[in-house]
Amino acid sequence: RVRKKDYFGIWSFPLIIAAVCAQSVNDPSNMSLVKETVDRLLKGYDIRLRPDFGGPPVAVGMNIDIASIDMVSEVNMDYTLTMYFQQAWRDKRLSYNVIPLNLTLDNRVADQLWVPDTYFLNDKKSFVHGVTVKNRMIRLHPDGTVLYGLRITTTTACMMDLRRYPLDEQNCTLEIESYGYTTDDIEFYWRGDDNAVTGVTKIELPQFSIVDYKLITKKVVFSTGSYPRLSLSFKLKRNIGYFILQTYMPSILITILSWVSFWINYDASAARVALGITTVLTMTTINTHLRETLPKIPYVKAIDMYLMGCFVFVFMALLEYALVNYIFFGRGPQRQKKAAEKAASANNEKMRLDVNKMDPHENILLSTLEIKNEMATSEAVMGLGDPRSTMLAYDASSIQYRKAGLPRHSFWRNALERHVAQKKSRLRERASQLKITIPDLTDVNAIDRWSRIFFPVVFSFFNIVYWLYYVN
């Protein structure tokens, strides 16, 4: 029992001493001791010389607590970061042993002490917050360790590769470097290794997700010497949800809307032209709005490829009706119709004259019409209105005569007369078929029917190729 009490007394003694010291420091009667200590530390302190001047380089440890990433701008190629930036180093000139506690001093004391000449290499604009006072902290430890903290908002350059935009990933860095001191005078390191940077996992961005981050320590060589550099690199993955709702879905719906013209009657010119022009102008507006939110870069982005593809489909749908309109209502079909009617009239007149010249006492050789069958004749006449058919040439039946030879038996003569009569009857029937007028086109054209299938199939294939390529 005695031994246990002794052990308890031994272990509790330092705690009691610390409590007494703390109380003595806070005691107004002992405030003079603290004041004397601070005055002694600052008296004769030369801010122009680094710690251990002429000796080994000063080791400066860095800590960053990220408060927020306020903005990532593709137009300016930068991002804005608010952070608590802390640096720690040992300055033996500031060590003390009279007070066994840390001294947190007024931020204005920092102007009287040596601090590292740290700067952000890729910084565009930075400032230290000053509400309600300048956000700086100076804390001294008995062994001379100095902790210097700042609350900083910095806008930092981030060179982005937007070829896969908006399906891209970007690497943005924060480069920390000494401006004047070389590696002979100062060294930088991450204080706490992988735990030197905190707050990254708590950050939420509207268009990005922080996939990963890494800490880098290196030395860079310039003409003036070798300098220490620390790098904090963020890997940002863009969230595609916003762009699907704002760009991709409207483009898809507008492209599908342009196909409605394939189901509108081809003679409804006003409706089809208005629909085509409206969809083309809408796609142009989407393209223009997108360009305003992005920098003027020389290469083609992924979203440019998609919008360009949608624009081509919409524009081709408008050209499809221009083709249909020309085929059905242009001058070409009218000329074909008139030429076909003229040829049919001439053929009918020629056959009528040739039939009247037939003599039953002559040996007549009738060659058949150069029409394969009645169905082919009907299709040829009906096909005059087909835009893909060329001008059909109607050849009259060639009728050849030759002088009668030796007299034949009357039986054969009668048979020949009956055969000639049948031929004449069939010729008249076929000739009458050539007089059929070209009917008015009231059915949907074959081009429209094929377009209803061709456009959706090709657009679906385009989407499959696009998403497989850029997502993977």
From Swiss-Prot:
PROSITE patterns: NEUROTR_ION_CHANNEL. Disulfide bonds join 158-172. One of its GO terms (cellular component) is plasma membrane. Allosterically activated by benzodiazepines. Allosterically activated by the anesthetic etomidate. Inhibited by the antagonist bicuculline. Potentiated by histamine. Histamine binds at residues 119, 178-179, 224. It catalyses: chloride(in) = chloride(out). Keywords: Cell membrane, Chloride, Chloride channel, Cytoplasmic vesicle, Disulfide bond, Glycoprotein, Ion channel, Ion transport, Ligand-gated ion channel, Membrane, Phosphoprotein, Postsynaptic cell membrane, Receptor, Signal, Synapse, Transmembrane, Transmembrane helix, Transport. Residues 24-239 are extracellular. GO terms for molecular function: chloride channel activity; extracellular ligand-gated monoatomic ion channel activity; GABA-A receptor activity. Residues 287-308 are annotated as: Etomidate binding. The keyword Zinc does not apply. Glycosylated. CDD domains: LGIC_ECD_GABAAR_B (cd18999), LGIC_TM_GABAAR_beta (cd19053). The modification Phosphotyrosine is found at residue 401. Glycans are attached at residues 30, 102. Residues 1-23 form the signal peptide. Residues 330-450 are cytoplasmic. It comes from the Eukaryota. The extracellular domain contributes to synaptic contact formation. GABAARs subunits share a common topological structure: a peptide sequence made up of a long extracellular N-terminal, four transmembrane domains, intracellular or cytoplasmic domain located between the third and the fourth transmembrane domains. Beta subunit of the heteropentameric ligand-gated chloride channel gated by gamma-aminobutyric acid (GABA), a major inhibitory neurotransmitter in the brain. GABA-gated chloride channels, also named GABA(A) receptors (GABAAR), consist of five subunits arranged around a central pore and contain GABA active binding site(s) located at the alpha and beta subunit interface(s). When activated by GABA, GABAARs selectively allow the flow of chloride anions across the cell membrane down their electrochemical gradient. Heteropentamer, formed by a combination of alpha (GABRA1-6), beta (GABRB1-3), gamma (GABRG1-3), delta (GABRD), epsilon (GABRE), rho (GABRR1-3), pi (GABRP) and theta (GABRQ) chains, each subunit exhibiting distinct physiological and pharmacological properties. Interacts with UBQLN1. May interact with KIF21B. Identified in a complex of 720 kDa composed of LHFPL4, NLGN2, GABRA1, GABRB2, GABRG2 and GABRB3. This is Gamma-aminobutyric acid receptor subunit beta-2. It comes from Bos taurus (Bovine). The gene is GABRB2.
